[in-house]
Amino acid sequence: MTTKHELVINTNEPSAPNADSFYPSYSNETSFSPQYQRDFSGFSGGGMIGEKMATRYEGRTLPRDSLMMIESQSPLNHRKTDFNDKTKTLPVYKNGGYPNLETFKVSRRETDEEEEHFKDYKINKISEYIKYLDTEIKDRERLKKNYGKLDKTLFGVECSCMITELGVTGTSFFIPPMVVISTPICLGLTVFSTVLRNGSKLITKKIDKHAHIELLAKSKRNSIDEKYTKAMEDGVISESEFQDIRKEIYNYDEMKKSILNQFKNNSQAIELTKEAQLTLINKGKEEMKEEFKIKLNKL
């Protein structure tokens, strides 16, 4: 059982003691050095001790398990110590006993309000990312649908031009005077159908581009949903989880740029093909003019 005595120490220091020089180095059997000796009052309500009591305790050794724990001069309690009061009542514990020291809370880097603020910030940013991907999906679906309608229209016009050209050409065989009229008509329809064919190819490439971006946006949207649901299982979105979600948006933007660059290169290839086709058309015009002159001479 721990025995507690009251020991009164009269301190003459006007300020807090130095924490580095406060605790002496103890061995198993040691005596207090003169710099740690104090003027003691009697135990348990006794008056000031005389020379007899001082002589009695002078040079007496204390075992290691009976060290004094002094609350008022502990470096942990400097903020609460009134050093203007020269007399302090200090507990002395024997048989290995220690006083109950006050538990100090370690200051946190972020308060609860800051934690809540960062949590709301992360949730709001993730909501913005999801909204951004949803907008991308809707825009790509709308553009793909509009380009699809335009492609169908061009295909129908091109088919009409081909049918008209075949009809005019067939009529010119049965009615020779119609050659004068049918030749420019066929040339115009050929050029127009060629332009429509190239336009249809360009629109098809645009449809493919928007379809790829739409598929990419849906994939990233599902990935963010899964990671967000997993992060909210414990009610807290850690910094690593938040950065992982942000990385999905970064990857989406990079892959989107790659798709756009690939489409741009394909568009340049289509332009080169168009120039080659126009060259062939011009060559065909010259041949048809020569053929037309030959037919007129025969008439």
UniProtKB/Swiss-Prot annotation:
UniProt entry keywords in alphabetical sequence: Membrane, Transmembrane, Transmembrane helix
Annotated TM spans: 172-192
Membrane topology note: Single-pass membrane protein
UniProt-annotated stretches for the region Disordered: 1-20
Major location (coarse): membrane
Localization annotation: Membrane
A cellular component annotation (GO) from this entry: membrane
Similarity field: Belongs to the IIV-6 259R family.
Name this protein carries in UniProt: Uncharacterized protein 259R
Taxonomic classification: Viruses, Varidnaviria, Bamfordvirae, Nucleocytoviricota, Megaviricetes
